[in-house]
């Protein structure tokens, strides 16, 4: 966030709009864009420091969102990122390229479910290749967090279809596994509001 000099003592000069590269990356159905911040250099050091800490607060809250969206998201992300940092094999193969696309989609969606459709995203690489990445990068991922990448379990983060149990069929982590709509209805119907003008939020700290 600060205007740092390079090894030669040359300070960064913001590029003009004509020379600025807005597109950072493009993969799957996504294009990643960045933007200039006009007036950034005119901010005081205190104002820049405030922006820094606001950004850090956002990063701290990010993991809450990941966990709320799906119970295995954080464990899966940790494994994928460890592979991405430590894999020393061929990074030009088709399967590695497929792995890169997958981890970028997971980053963008804050989890393994698509940010619009809520469908679980399928990897373009084989289970055997993923096993080789885990082994060669000394990464551990086992049990349900491993299996769910490749199987059809928890295929929808939020399932809004009619005629199904929307709570049971949704993988979102607001409720524990195997909780049904009937469980939710009974839970809330048993609660009372002592003062209707000051309603209590019973569900904030409960996964039933």
List the predicted regions and their residue ranges.
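N-terminal helix-rich structural modules
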Residues: 11-208
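C-terminal motif of bacterial Sec signal peptides marking the signal peptidase cleavage site
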Residues: 2-5
